[in-house]
Regions:
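Conserved beta-strand segments of alpha/beta enzyme cores
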Residues: 93, 178, 243-244, 261
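Noncatalytic alpha-helical scaffolds and linker/capping helices
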Residues: 120-121
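Short hydrophobic/aromatic-enriched beta-strand-loop microsegments
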Residues: 139-144, 242-248
Length: 280
């Protein structure tokens, strides 16, 4: 017995088939688009350049005199605020060192305009000036502590000298700053003008790291004093479990970089816009 279909039923069958074909084509096309998007994003991430800006001591313009005049570790508070405001207005987002570590390992994609802010030594001015500015802007930073000079009790700030952070102040800044190691007591120069880290034996470097750990806890992130290191230094840090280490150089961080030879821009030497204009 032959089945008879009405015109309406036939139209419904054709419509259903058409919809199925369209859905299949759309699914396939979407898959291609997603693959293209994923490839494009991967390419962008592979090419992404992350500036790491290095600061030290902040001093108000009115107090830049004496030992702070033409001092290569000093930037004025006013200039620092101006630079941070400029970054914010241009859409830059600060990232943590853990994010940078995952980015280098290919495990995380970063925002288009990512940047890392670092401060060496652990000056009290970081607490007095940098901390409230970054807090106000919703920015994150890293302080590489010279653990041998961290104070047991908070010190009175004065522009007539240099004071360092206390452990109490370090704890208070945890909402804005994370902390790495700038050695415990190897922030010195040899007679030839090189960082003493370059002359230290692996045993001495490891012992210095252990002193830092006893004071600040685990050390995953490290900054070479004066930017100086040797292959032996790097081998020691790797054995000791350090994940990222920073030196000085006019280059941005990108995938493929050695995580123990990452470059920081010394912001005493460069203008912010000069740094940003080098991003490709």
């Amino acid at each position: 017995m032959k089945m008879k279909f009405t015109q309406r039923e036939i139209r419904q069958v054709f419509l259903a088939c058409g919809l199925m074909l369209m859905l299949g084509w759309f699914t396939l096309y979407s898959s291609y688009l997603w693959q293209d998007y994923t490839v494009s994003q991967n390419i962008l991430q592979e090419k992404k350049q992350v500036p790491v800006l290095m600061y030290h001591h902040l001093v108000p313009q009115a107090e830049v005199y004496g030992i702070f005049a033409d001092n290569n570790i000093v930037i004025t508070v006013e200039k620092f605020r101006e630079q941070m405001t400029c970054l914010k207005e241009q859409g830059y987002q600060t990232i943590s060192l853990a994010q940078l570590q995952r980015f280098l390992a290919g495990e995380e994609e970063l925002p288009q305009k990512s940047i890392v802010l670092t401060f060496d030594d652990g000056y009290l001015s970081n607490y007095k000036y940098a901390y409230p500015i970054l807090q106000e802007l919703g920015y994150h930073g890293v302080i590489f502590l010279l653990t041998s000079v961290v104070e047991e009790q908070p010190q009175q700030y004065t522009a007539r000298g240099v004071q360092y952070l206390s452990w109490q102040e370090i704890a208070q800044m945890g909402d804005v700053f994370e902390f790495g190691c700038h050695t415990d007591h190897l922030h010195k120069l040899t007679l030839s003008g090189k960082g003493i880290l370059t002359a230290a034996s692996p045993t001495e470097v490891a012992a210095d790291l252990e002193l830092a750990r006893q004071k600040m806890g685990e050390v995953s992130y490290y900054c070479y004093p004066y930017g100086h290191y040797t292959e032996r230094t790097i081998e020691t840090l790797e054995r000791e479990g350090v994940k990222l280490a920073f030196t000085i150089g006019a280059e941005h961080v990108k995938r493929g970089d050695d995580p123990l030879r990452l470059k920081c821009w010394d912001m005493y030497q460069y203008e912010l816009q000069e740094v940003l204009e080098t991003i490709q």
